[in-house]
């Protein structure tokens, strides 16, 4: 990841065609690390989640690997990203079907799982901000990744990227992007923003905020900023790093 800022349901997830899916359990190795840099800001506004072993219960014996990772690129303060760090993984886990008995039934509703989790986190943070005077202005992008066996599912809002490095036949690496950049210049985003009466100026909403989907950003909720994530999935191959 790079920090910056159902049946039919799964048809809205895009997947890259593959030739060599991983089959062996021993190939399911997950190494996780993180790095962060404050830059010129007065405080660190970005957070992350690393859960290489994301426990969904002992009864999920059909899972050889289950991991959860996330990055939150905060802006206008650290409170939104910190709230996401403390609540997002639980919100996702709580929405995984408890009655799932196989991989298909577990993954069938993942788009709803992520969409509802993002909405719950956003609602919770917005409610918290409104308890303070003045109301907090903090906001954050959110990119969450769940790895289940040889499948990667990525949900995101904002412009923090998730990328898989895939080795080509000549040995070089090619990036496979698993996120969608949500910015006011994109047609769908701009149309939604303009319907509220806001304008897109210099690539920003009313010349201020440069992402069109986020957690928090209370002053911009009425100007078309939403928290609905896009979801992509990818089948890992033996050529993926």
Report residues per predicted region:
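PP2C/PPM-type serine/threonine phosphatase catalytic core
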Residues: 1-241
């Amino acid at each position: 990841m790079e920090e910056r800022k159902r049946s039919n349901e799964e048809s809205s997830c895009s997947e890259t065609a593959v030739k060599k899916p991983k089959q062996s359990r021993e190939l399911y190795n997950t190494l996780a690390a993180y790095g962060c840099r404050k830059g010129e800001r007065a405080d660190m506004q970005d957070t992350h989640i690393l859960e290489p072993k994301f426990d969904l219960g002992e009864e999920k014996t059909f899972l050889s690997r289950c991991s959860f990772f996330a990055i939150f690129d905060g802006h206008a303060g650290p409170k939104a990203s910190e709230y996401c760090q403390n609540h997002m993984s639980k919100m996702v886990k709580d929405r995984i079907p408890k009655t799932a008995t196989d991989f298909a039934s577990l993954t069938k509703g993942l788009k709803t799982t992520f969409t509802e989790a993002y909405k719950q986190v956003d609602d919770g943070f917005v409610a918290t901000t409104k308890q303070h005077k003045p109301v907090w202005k903090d906001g954050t992008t959110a990119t969450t990744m769940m790895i289940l066996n040889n499948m990667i599912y990525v949900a995101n809002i904002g412009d923090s990227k998730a990328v898989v490095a895939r080795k080509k036949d000549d040995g070089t690496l090619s990036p496979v992007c698993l996120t969608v950049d949500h910015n006011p210049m994109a047609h769908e985003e701009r149309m939604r923003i303009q319907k509220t009466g806001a304008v897109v100026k210099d690539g920003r909403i009313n010349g201020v905020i440069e992402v069109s989907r986020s957690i928090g950003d209370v002053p911009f909720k009425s100007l078309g900023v939403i928290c609905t994530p896009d979801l992509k999935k990818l089948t890992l191959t033996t050529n993926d790093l």
